[in-house]
Swiss-Prot record:
This is Actin-related protein 4. One of its GO terms (cellular component) is Swr1 complex. GO terms for biological process: chromatin remodeling; DNA repair; kinetochore assembly; regulation of transcription by RNA polymerase II. Keywords: Activator, Chromatin regulator, DNA damage, DNA repair, Nucleus, Transcription, Transcription regulation. It comes from Candida albicans (strain SC5314 / ATCC MYA-2876) (Yeast). The gene is ARP4. Residues 262-282, 321-360 are annotated as: Disordered. InterPro entries: Actin, Actin_CS, ATPase_NBD. It holds the Pfam family Actin. It comes from the Eukaryota. One of its GO terms (molecular function) is chromatin binding. Belongs to the actin family. ARP4 subfamily.
Amino acid sequence: MATASTTTVYGGDEINAIVLDPGSYTTRIGYAGDDFPKVITSSYYGQVKNDKKKIFGESINVPRANYDIKPILKESIIVDWDAAIEQYQYYFDQQLKVVGPEQPILITEPIWTETSYRQQLVETFFENFEFSGIYLAKSPTCVSFQQGRSNCLVVDLGHDSVSVTPVIDGICLLKSSMKTNYGGKFLSNEIQDYLIDTKKVVMEPSFKIKSKIPTTYPDPPKYELKNNNTIPTSSSSSLSQSFLEFQNEKIYHNFKEILEVPEKNSSSGTTTTTTTTNKDSSRLFELPTGQSIVIDRFKIAESIFDPTIYKFTNSKLSFPPNNGEISITQANEYRPLKRVRKNDDEEEDSNQSTPKPEVNIRGISQLISHTLSNIDIDLRASLANNIIVTGGVSLISQLTERLYLELSNNNPGLKIRLHAVGNSTERINQAWIGGSVLASLGTFHQMWVTKEEYNEVGVDRILNQRFR
């Protein structure tokens, strides 16, 4: 692999920057300027009890006795730094052949990172990997660059979280952003509750199945497990709960692929579910044991818009109420110019004189409508006309159509326009692709924070002045 020399790292087009997009479920790594990441890997790792070795990539799916699966990130924030460093080092060395002192790195980050986390992130990549330059880019900003829309509203439906972020002039308005946990993991918990706790079906990962005979629920499954001493049977305690849950998550992921958001009709300013036949909503889903079960694909998908609609049998799987309002404290908050600027006292008095009813839970359309209603009126029309929908959960059938209808009904004074990439591979990699576009711009060389600047001014000043 050709690498850029130190003198060309900040000279424009010749740099060979690395782009890292760490997500809760998947991590993406590649070269700036490429269309897609070179590495797309799980954000989990495996580790055998009493063994320091960490296992990454597809190898984590190999069953082992006393073997746990652990997350590296939660809500797109690193929670296991040792594992993160080891995983990134593995892919930097083995697949990308990175030469840290000769290459800069752009790292995407969610909008809700705290200052202490960002400090550790910068210090880790300068000290442990010795990159020549670093830039931290907000994920919504990267998505906006991928779409070529400097002013937009980025709606990201991810695994651990759902977020709505206004982006103005390529900069995220943190105080106007919203986030809930009603994303892919929330849907997985509903599916788990439906299959295991409500229907009491037998869950066996596919790697344990030797043969099976098709059956239909409520008839019991007919299958034979592999007779292999290296693969413990269901009654064995050798397979850890975390490993089994990780394998079951793949079943839930396949389940989510057949979900569909039900249509809605507008009636007197409200939305009501249209009458659908059981044939429309019901689908057969085959489990690894060969047992097929009829599922209502509308009911679970509806929880994206109304998180209260599904009633959990197992309360431990339910999520606490979340209205999406978050408190983000980062220095140098960007404030776009307004047509008429009020002073702080007038704004405070205005907010106090208009009390708002308390809302405990918000679905996706409510999050977006609430964000639009709270944004400056001069920005509202532009953002409503440039709503970018991204993330794996957004691929659920009919989601964007339903979202457009609800937003149009809830915001009659605005022209709603959704932008969702038709290519599913491109949509789930949208933040990385945007980072690739951003880091490959000839004018971006002045944005890199060098190792020399880091040593000279320190991480605190870098965060305050260079990264927004």
